[in-house]
Amino acid sequence: MWNYEKRLQYPINIKTPNAKISQFIMSQYGGPDGEIGASLRYLSQRFTMPNRMASAVLNDIGTEELAHLEMVSTIVHQLTRDLSMEEIEKSGFGPYYIDHTVGVWPQAAGGVPFNACEFQSKGDPVTDLFENLAAEQKARSTYDNILRVVRNIPEIADPIRFLRAREVVHFQRFGEALRSVQEQLDSKNFYAFNPSFDCPCEASCKKC
């Protein structure tokens, strides 16, 4: 079902450490709109999708988010692996260093640890897919913010641009999945029932 290729989706080769920028990018590792939450969200939601197409989209994107997680963690690692103690102290990286040295650990740019309350798996395909559309836009916005900071550093900006572009593609794929779910609904009111749980004909046809 799945094949792991031992290479990054996009090459990363950062030669100059930068502790301050690493803290910004770290947010896409374990922040509120980061890749850990995205992968867990989609891989959890896939089980209650009402058709194979929507389930496959969630599975494909959820596993790709794991590849993006690998990319973001590689960027953070390369930005911090050769830091001197002077750089750590001057950059404000000290509190992170005390707890994790230069290990990669999931937290937001502000230092808030990752937690699963930052994503949902509601069991309602329409609800979940709308959440996913919003999640991809929030991730794109975060990458936009990062790009404003690193725009003049090509070795960082180039892989970030790649990640941003994939968020746009994911948004489009989730739109396709949402349409496939809505087209299967009998009611023009998409919120009349949960197609993964309720039976819309239960009251009238007694066949469910």
Task: For each feature predicted by the language model, list its residue ranges.
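Non-heme di-metal
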Residues: 1-208
